[in-house]
Curated annotation (Swiss-Prot):
It is found in: Cytoplasm. It comes from the Bacteria. Belongs to the RimP family. GO terms for cellular component: cytosol. This is Ribosome maturation factor RimP. Required for maturation of 30S ribosomal subunits. It comes from Prochlorococcus marinus (strain MIT 9215).
């Protein structure tokens, strides 16, 4: 599929998604598959979770738009799915949801020789992140934090 057609298809599908209060995160067209696979990753514009029903409901109008556009001149399989959970914690909701979970904190090393700290997510405030490292609470100022990701802890 030509890049121009993919871009046109993306524009059309974004309009359909907007009508359903959805946002398209990505469209991947796998022309090396037989039949061609069109994968669309969606999320809700209000930040709520995507359900299986949301994906199913979006499938029909998305498929209709693809058919009416005549941009795909071959048989295809349409897959609609959610963005899924990212390992990186960014929103306040993430920090509330994953309180007590193991995290890896990447540090900027401005004030520390360590690159990473691992522990259990304890608390997030406006100024700092607190993690539990082997029973001791460590407060890390946010200006020292580059990234916070979920991880698995080893003894």
């Amino acid at each position: 599929m030509y890049k121009e057609n993919k871009n046109k298809l993306e524009i059309l599908l974004k309009k359909v998604a907007n009508e359903w209060d959805l946002k398209i995160c990505s469209i991947n067209i796998q022309t090396n598959q037989n039949p061609t696979v069109v994968k669309i990753i969606i999320k809700k514009t209000n930040g709520d979770d995507i359900s299986l029903e949301d994906c199913a409901l979006f499938n029909a109008p998305a498929s209709e738009e693809i058919e009416n556009s005549n941009l795909l001149n071959c048989s295809y399989v349409l897959e609609i799915s959610s963005q899924g959970v990212s390992d990186e914690l960014t929103s306040d909701r993430d920090f509330k949801t994953f309180k007590g979970f193991p995290v890896n904190v990447q540090l900027n090393q401005k004030n520390s020789k360590k690159k990473f700290l691992n522990g259990l997510l304890y608390e997030k405030s406006n100024d700092y992140l607190a993690i539990n490292i082997k029973g001791k609470i460590k407060k890390i100022p946010f200006d020292e934090v580059l990234k916070i990701s979920l991880c698995t802890l080893k003894d």
